[in-house]
Protein backbone atom coordinates (compact mmCIF):
# COMPACT_ATOMS: atom_id res chain seq x y z
CA UNK A 1 0.00 0.00 0.00
CA UNK A 2 1.44 3.37 -1.02
CA UNK A 3 1.76 6.06 1.63
CA UNK A 4 -0.32 9.21 1.32
CA UNK A 5 0.93 11.36 -1.54
CA UNK A 6 2.78 8.48 -3.17
CA UNK A 7 1.90 6.81 -6.44
CA UNK A 8 3.39 3.34 -6.10
CA UNK A 9 1.61 0.22 -7.32
CA UNK A 10 0.99 -2.44 -4.67
CA UNK A 11 2.18 -5.19 -7.03
CA UNK A 12 2.65 -5.84 -10.75
CA UNK A 13 -1.02 -6.66 -11.33
CA UNK A 14 -1.95 -3.08 -10.43
CA UNK A 15 -0.04 -1.91 -13.51
CA UNK A 16 -2.37 -3.65 -15.97
CA UNK A 17 -4.57 -1.47 -18.18
CA UNK A 18 -4.97 2.27 -18.73
CA UNK A 19 -2.81 2.09 -21.83
CA UNK A 20 -2.55 5.26 -23.95
CA UNK A 21 -3.95 6.08 -27.38
CA UNK A 22 -1.88 7.82 -30.05
CA UNK A 23 -2.79 9.16 -33.49
CA UNK A 24 -1.22 7.57 -36.56
CA UNK A 25 0.22 10.32 -38.76
CA UNK A 26 2.58 8.94 -41.43
CA UNK A 27 0.97 5.72 -42.68
CA UNK A 28 -2.49 7.17 -43.25
CA UNK A 29 -2.30 8.33 -46.88
CA UNK A 30 -5.74 8.66 -48.42
CA UNK A 31 -7.58 8.33 -45.12
CA UNK A 32 -10.80 10.27 -44.66
CA UNK A 33 -10.99 9.42 -40.95
CA UNK A 34 -8.45 9.86 -38.18
CA UNK A 35 -6.90 6.73 -36.69
CA UNK A 36 -5.84 6.39 -33.05
CA UNK A 37 -3.99 3.29 -31.86
CA UNK A 38 -4.67 1.78 -28.43
CA UNK A 39 -1.15 0.81 -27.34
CA UNK A 40 -1.52 -2.51 -25.54
CA UNK A 41 2.22 -2.81 -26.21
CA UNK A 42 2.58 -0.73 -23.03
CA UNK A 43 1.12 -3.34 -20.67
CA UNK A 44 3.51 -4.72 -17.97
CA UNK A 45 4.38 -7.70 -20.18
CA UNK A 46 3.85 -5.86 -23.46
CA UNK A 47 0.56 -7.33 -24.71
CA UNK A 48 -3.20 -7.06 -24.43
CA UNK A 49 -3.21 -10.60 -23.02
CA UNK A 50 -1.94 -9.29 -19.67
CA UNK A 51 -5.55 -8.28 -19.06
CA UNK A 52 -6.97 -11.78 -19.46
CA UNK A 53 -4.05 -13.41 -17.67
CA UNK A 54 -5.16 -11.37 -14.67
CA UNK A 55 -8.91 -11.78 -15.16
CA UNK A 56 -9.00 -15.54 -15.76
CA UNK A 57 -6.80 -16.40 -12.78
CA UNK A 58 -8.57 -13.94 -10.47
CA UNK A 59 -12.00 -15.16 -11.59
CA UNK A 60 -11.06 -18.81 -10.95
CA UNK A 61 -9.70 -17.91 -7.51
CA UNK A 62 -12.85 -16.01 -6.57
CA UNK A 63 -14.93 -19.04 -7.57
CA UNK A 64 -12.77 -21.34 -5.44
CA UNK A 65 -11.63 -23.34 -8.48
CA UNK A 66 -7.88 -22.88 -7.95
CA UNK A 67 -5.51 -22.35 -5.03
CA UNK A 68 -1.90 -21.07 -5.14
CA UNK A 69 0.63 -23.79 -4.36
CA UNK A 70 -1.90 -26.57 -4.96
CA UNK A 71 -3.47 -26.10 -8.38
CA UNK A 72 -1.61 -26.68 -11.65
CA UNK A 73 -2.75 -24.27 -14.34
CA UNK A 74 -2.77 -25.48 -17.95
CA UNK A 75 -3.48 -23.42 -21.06
CA UNK A 76 -3.07 -23.70 -24.84
CA UNK A 77 -1.63 -20.46 -26.19
CA UNK A 78 -0.09 -18.83 -29.26
CA UNK A 79 2.24 -17.12 -26.82
CA UNK A 80 0.96 -13.82 -25.53
CA UNK A 81 -1.80 -15.26 -23.34
CA UNK A 82 0.79 -17.66 -22.00
CA UNK A 83 3.02 -14.75 -21.06
CA UNK A 84 0.09 -12.93 -19.46
CA UNK A 85 -0.64 -16.04 -17.42
CA UNK A 86 3.04 -16.75 -16.68
CA UNK A 87 3.79 -13.45 -14.98
CA UNK A 88 0.55 -13.75 -13.01
CA UNK A 89 1.34 -17.35 -12.02
CA UNK A 90 4.82 -16.28 -10.91
CA UNK A 91 3.42 -13.42 -8.84
CA UNK A 92 0.75 -15.59 -7.23
CA UNK A 93 2.65 -18.87 -6.79
CA UNK A 94 1.08 -21.24 -9.32
CA UNK A 95 2.70 -23.96 -11.41
CA UNK A 96 1.83 -23.29 -15.06
CA UNK A 97 2.00 -25.64 -18.05
CA UNK A 98 1.49 -24.15 -21.51
CA UNK A 99 0.91 -25.91 -24.84
CA UNK A 100 1.91 -23.89 -27.90
CA UNK A 101 2.32 -24.48 -31.65
CA UNK A 102 6.03 -24.82 -32.49
CA UNK A 103 5.63 -22.10 -35.16
CA UNK A 104 5.45 -19.33 -32.56
CA UNK A 105 8.47 -17.08 -32.06
CA UNK A 106 11.56 -18.05 -30.07
CA UNK A 107 11.12 -14.95 -27.90
CA UNK A 108 7.85 -16.38 -26.61
CA UNK A 109 9.55 -19.63 -25.55
CA UNK A 110 12.35 -17.78 -23.76
CA UNK A 111 10.03 -15.35 -21.95
CA UNK A 112 7.69 -18.13 -20.82
CA UNK A 113 10.58 -20.13 -19.39
CA UNK A 114 12.00 -17.00 -17.73
CA UNK A 115 8.75 -16.75 -15.75
CA UNK A 116 9.08 -20.40 -14.72
CA UNK A 117 6.37 -21.83 -16.95
CA UNK A 118 6.63 -25.37 -18.32
CA UNK A 119 6.27 -25.35 -22.12
CA UNK A 120 5.02 -28.16 -24.38
CA UNK A 121 5.31 -27.54 -28.14
CA UNK A 122 2.74 -28.97 -30.56
CA UNK A 123 2.60 -29.65 -34.32
CA UNK A 124 2.44 -26.26 -36.08
CA UNK A 125 0.31 -27.73 -38.89
CA UNK A 126 -2.42 -28.44 -36.34
CA UNK A 127 -2.48 -24.79 -35.23
CA UNK A 128 -4.30 -23.87 -32.04
CA UNK A 129 -6.53 -26.94 -32.31
CA UNK A 130 -3.44 -29.09 -31.76
CA UNK A 131 -2.40 -27.03 -28.73
CA UNK A 132 -5.90 -27.31 -27.26
CA UNK A 133 -5.95 -31.08 -27.77
CA UNK A 134 -2.58 -31.45 -26.04
CA UNK A 135 -3.74 -29.31 -23.09
CA UNK A 136 -6.79 -31.57 -22.69
CA UNK A 137 -4.57 -34.67 -22.77
CA UNK A 138 -2.27 -33.28 -20.07
CA UNK A 139 -5.16 -32.22 -17.83
CA UNK A 140 -6.76 -35.67 -18.05
CA UNK A 141 -3.60 -37.24 -16.59
CA UNK A 142 -2.87 -34.62 -13.95
CA UNK A 143 -4.70 -34.23 -10.63
CA UNK A 144 -5.38 -30.71 -9.33
CA UNK A 145 -5.04 -29.31 -12.86
CA UNK A 146 -7.24 -26.55 -14.24
CA UNK A 147 -7.49 -25.36 -17.85
CA UNK A 148 -8.31 -21.66 -18.00
CA UNK A 149 -9.81 -21.97 -21.53
CA UNK A 150 -9.24 -18.52 -22.96
CA UNK A 151 -11.36 -19.36 -26.04
CA UNK A 152 -14.39 -20.25 -23.89
CA UNK A 153 -13.88 -18.36 -20.61
CA UNK A 154 -16.37 -15.49 -20.04
CA UNK A 155 -13.73 -13.77 -17.86
CA UNK A 156 -11.86 -13.06 -21.12
CA UNK A 157 -14.36 -10.66 -22.77
CA UNK A 158 -15.55 -9.48 -19.34
CA UNK A 159 -12.24 -7.76 -18.52
CA UNK A 160 -12.37 -5.89 -21.84
CA UNK A 161 -15.96 -4.87 -21.14
CA UNK A 162 -14.91 -3.59 -17.71
CA UNK A 163 -11.60 -1.94 -18.68
CA UNK A 164 -10.61 -1.68 -22.35
CA UNK A 165 -13.97 -0.38 -23.54
CA UNK A 166 -14.33 2.26 -20.81
CA UNK A 167 -10.71 3.35 -21.32
CA UNK A 168 -11.33 3.99 -25.04
CA UNK A 169 -14.60 5.78 -24.35
CA UNK A 170 -12.96 8.02 -21.75
CA UNK A 171 -9.80 8.74 -23.76
CA UNK A 172 -11.83 9.78 -26.82
CA UNK A 173 -14.38 11.72 -24.74
CA UNK A 174 -17.04 9.50 -26.29
CA UNK A 175 -16.08 10.57 -29.81
CA UNK A 176 -15.00 7.14 -31.08
CA UNK A 177 -16.95 6.10 -34.19
CA UNK A 178 -15.26 2.86 -35.22
CA UNK A 179 -13.36 0.08 -33.42
CA UNK A 180 -10.94 -2.17 -35.32
CA UNK A 181 -9.54 -5.24 -33.57
CA UNK A 182 -7.86 -8.45 -34.63
CA UNK A 183 -9.67 -11.65 -33.66
CA UNK A 184 -7.73 -14.35 -31.84
CA UNK A 185 -9.93 -15.55 -28.99
CA UNK A 186 -12.40 -12.79 -29.81
CA UNK A 187 -12.30 -11.51 -26.25
CA UNK A 188 -10.99 -8.03 -27.03
CA UNK A 189 -13.42 -7.25 -29.83
CA UNK A 190 -16.37 -8.80 -27.97
CA UNK A 191 -15.92 -7.15 -24.59
CA UNK A 192 -14.73 -3.80 -25.91
CA UNK A 193 -17.28 -3.75 -28.72
CA UNK A 194 -20.17 -4.60 -26.40
CA UNK A 195 -19.30 -1.76 -24.04
CA UNK A 196 -18.85 0.79 -26.82
CA UNK A 197 -22.09 -0.15 -28.57
CA UNK A 198 -23.95 0.19 -25.27
CA UNK A 199 -22.65 3.76 -25.01
CA UNK A 200 -23.44 4.53 -28.66
CA UNK A 201 -25.27 1.96 -30.83
CA UNK A 202 -24.03 3.78 -33.95
CA UNK A 203 -20.41 2.75 -33.31
CA UNK A 204 -19.18 0.26 -35.91
CA UNK A 205 -17.10 -2.78 -34.94
CA UNK A 206 -14.66 -4.29 -37.43
CA UNK A 207 -12.89 -7.58 -36.80
CA UNK A 208 -9.67 -8.58 -38.56
CA UNK A 209 -8.68 -12.07 -39.70
CA UNK A 210 -5.96 -13.51 -41.97
CA UNK A 211 -6.84 -13.90 -45.64
CA UNK A 212 -5.19 -17.31 -45.51
CA UNK A 213 -7.50 -18.53 -42.73
CA UNK A 214 -10.68 -16.52 -43.20
CA UNK A 215 -13.03 -18.66 -41.12
CA UNK A 216 -15.33 -15.81 -40.09
CA UNK A 217 -15.72 -14.80 -43.73
CA UNK A 218 -16.80 -18.32 -44.69
CA UNK A 219 -13.37 -19.57 -45.76
CA UNK A 220 -11.32 -22.58 -44.72
CA UNK A 221 -8.66 -22.69 -42.00
CA UNK A 222 -5.09 -22.52 -43.22
CA UNK A 223 -1.53 -21.68 -42.18
CA UNK A 224 -0.57 -18.01 -41.93
CA UNK A 225 2.08 -15.80 -40.35
CA UNK A 226 -0.03 -13.42 -38.27
CA UNK A 227 0.71 -14.79 -34.80
CA UNK A 228 -2.13 -14.24 -32.33
CA UNK A 229 -5.13 -14.03 -34.68
CA UNK A 230 -6.82 -16.50 -37.01
CA UNK A 231 -7.06 -19.53 -34.72
CA UNK A 232 -8.75 -21.62 -37.43
CA UNK A 233 -12.13 -21.93 -35.70
CA UNK A 234 -14.85 -19.69 -34.29
CA UNK A 235 -14.03 -19.13 -30.58
CA UNK A 236 -16.79 -19.60 -28.03
CA UNK A 237 -16.29 -16.17 -26.44
CA UNK A 238 -16.62 -14.33 -29.77
CA UNK A 239 -19.99 -12.63 -30.23
CA UNK A 240 -20.21 -12.47 -34.03
CA UNK A 241 -23.43 -10.46 -33.80
CA UNK A 242 -21.40 -7.47 -32.56
CA UNK A 243 -19.33 -7.41 -35.75
CA UNK A 244 -20.43 -5.04 -38.48
CA UNK A 245 -17.78 -6.42 -40.81
CA UNK A 246 -14.75 -8.72 -40.84
CA UNK A 247 -11.76 -7.41 -42.80
CA UNK A 248 -9.32 -9.89 -44.33
CA UNK A 249 -5.60 -9.01 -44.30
CA UNK A 250 -2.85 -11.18 -45.78
CA UNK A 251 0.29 -12.14 -43.87
CA UNK A 252 2.46 -10.18 -46.31
CA UNK A 253 0.33 -7.04 -45.88
CA UNK A 254 0.48 -7.36 -42.09
CA UNK A 255 4.26 -7.84 -42.04
CA UNK A 256 4.85 -4.93 -44.41
CA UNK A 257 2.68 -2.59 -42.34
CA UNK A 258 4.32 -3.62 -39.05
CA UNK A 259 7.66 -2.63 -40.61
CA UNK A 260 6.23 0.71 -41.77
CA UNK A 261 4.83 1.47 -38.32
CA UNK A 262 8.34 1.18 -36.88
CA UNK A 263 10.00 3.19 -39.65
CA UNK A 264 7.40 5.95 -40.03
CA UNK A 265 5.50 6.16 -36.72
CA UNK A 266 8.22 5.04 -34.30
CA UNK A 267 5.95 2.24 -33.08
CA UNK A 268 7.62 -1.17 -32.73
CA UNK A 269 4.68 -3.56 -32.92
CA UNK A 270 3.95 -7.19 -33.71
CA UNK A 271 2.53 -8.68 -36.89
CA UNK A 272 -1.08 -8.70 -35.66
CA UNK A 273 -0.79 -4.96 -34.98
CA UNK A 274 0.29 -4.58 -38.60
CA UNK A 275 -2.80 -6.50 -39.69
CA UNK A 276 -5.06 -4.34 -37.53
CA UNK A 277 -3.46 -1.18 -38.94
CA UNK A 278 -4.00 -2.34 -42.54
CA UNK A 279 -7.68 -2.95 -41.77
CA UNK A 280 -8.05 0.37 -39.94
CA UNK A 281 -6.52 2.28 -42.86
CA UNK A 282 -8.84 0.58 -45.36
CA UNK A 283 -11.85 1.49 -43.25
CA UNK A 284 -10.58 5.05 -42.71
CA UNK A 285 -10.15 5.52 -46.48
CA UNK A 286 -13.85 4.96 -47.16
CA UNK A 287 -15.63 8.21 -48.12
CA UNK A 288 -18.52 7.52 -45.75
CA UNK A 289 -16.09 7.70 -42.82
CA UNK A 290 -14.86 11.22 -43.56
CA UNK A 291 -14.25 13.14 -40.31
CA UNK A 292 -14.76 10.10 -38.08
CA UNK A 293 -12.44 8.63 -35.44
CA UNK A 294 -11.21 5.06 -35.81
CA UNK A 295 -9.65 3.37 -32.78
CA UNK A 296 -7.46 0.36 -33.58
CA UNK A 297 -6.02 -2.02 -30.98
CA UNK A 298 -2.27 -2.73 -31.26
CA UNK A 299 -2.04 -5.97 -29.22
CA UNK A 300 1.67 -6.62 -28.73
CA UNK A 301 5.21 -5.20 -28.78
CA UNK A 302 7.52 -5.87 -31.73
CA UNK A 303 10.48 -6.98 -29.63
CA UNK A 304 8.61 -10.26 -29.09
CA UNK A 305 9.01 -11.01 -32.82
CA UNK A 306 12.75 -10.46 -33.36
CA UNK A 307 13.29 -14.07 -34.47
CA UNK A 308 10.18 -14.13 -36.67
CA UNK A 309 9.72 -13.38 -40.37
CA UNK A 310 8.97 -9.77 -39.38
CA UNK A 311 12.64 -9.02 -38.73
CA UNK A 312 14.21 -11.77 -40.86
CA UNK A 313 16.16 -9.49 -43.21
CA UNK A 314 17.27 -7.13 -40.43
CA UNK A 315 18.40 -10.09 -38.32
CA UNK A 316 20.58 -11.40 -41.17
CA UNK A 317 22.01 -7.93 -41.73
CA UNK A 318 22.78 -7.50 -38.03
CA UNK A 319 24.40 -10.94 -37.78
CA UNK A 320 26.70 -10.19 -40.72
CA UNK A 321 27.93 -6.87 -39.37
CA UNK A 322 31.62 -6.53 -38.50
CA UNK A 323 33.34 -3.99 -36.32
CA UNK A 324 35.23 -1.13 -37.88
CA UNK A 325 38.93 -0.87 -36.91
Curated annotation (Swiss-Prot):
It catalyses: O-acetyl-L-serine + hydrogen sulfide = L-cysteine + acetate. This is Cysteine synthase. Pyridoxal 5'-phosphate binds at residues 80, 184-188, 272. It is an enzyme of class 2 (transferase). It comes from the Eukaryota. Pfam families: PALP. Disulfide bonds: none annotated. GO terms for cellular component: cytoplasm. Keywords: Amino-acid biosynthesis, Cysteine biosynthesis, Cytoplasm, Pyridoxal phosphate, Transferase. Its cofactor is pyridoxal 5'-phosphate. Pathway: Amino-acid biosynthesis; L-cysteine biosynthesis; L-cysteine from L-serine: step 2/2.
Amino acid sequence: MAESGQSIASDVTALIGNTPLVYLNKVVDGCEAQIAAKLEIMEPCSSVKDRIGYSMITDAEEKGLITPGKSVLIEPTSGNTGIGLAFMAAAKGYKLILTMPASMSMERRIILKAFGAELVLTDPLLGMKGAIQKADELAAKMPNSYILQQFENPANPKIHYETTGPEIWKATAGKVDILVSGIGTGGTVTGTGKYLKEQNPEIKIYGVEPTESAILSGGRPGPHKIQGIGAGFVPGVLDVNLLDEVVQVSSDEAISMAKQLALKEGLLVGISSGAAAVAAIRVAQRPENKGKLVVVVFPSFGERYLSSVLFESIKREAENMVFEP
